[in-house]
Amino acid sequence: NAEIVPQSITDTEIILSLNDAPSQTLQAGIQPLQVLHSSPSSAVPVASNACPFVLRPTVTSVQVAEVEGIDDDPRGGSLQVSAHLPVGANQRVVIALNEWSIETPAVYLFEAPARKQDTTCLTIPFTGVKPGDYLIRLQVDGADSQLGVDTDPSSKTFNWFNSPRVVIE
């Protein structure tokens, strides 16, 4: 838990920056938010009900390791994925691979194995994946990382999702 002083308070809105929260207090996924109102006339602050908000993970890097398979055979191996926020030891983590193709794209979901501690670096094994170029999403307790979009109007892939991507050979 962390106490953050709001940047702005009105009758209908409270604005605060998550950058003011100590980094070890935030994790990807669903977070509780509660308002504590202290008063000079009371030693005990008045607390609001907790309200959930979703903090999306961001994939900062992805690498393929220990790939097995030849020719057109499905591949097995592991993905080493780094996130911008810690993932809790007890949080459910799923990696989604969406083939980057305009034809019928393959889709794969792989659950990360249990972890002994919070981490920003995850190793997720995969099996049965056809060789190809894939968009990758990290899902932590139901909160999906966002995909990047090609914003170059002169590009053949303008407005297509384009990152993060990984090639499985």
PLM region spans:
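Generic preference for flexible, low-structure residues
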Residues: 69, 111, 150-154
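Short beta-strand segments of immunoglobulin-like
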Residues: 62-72
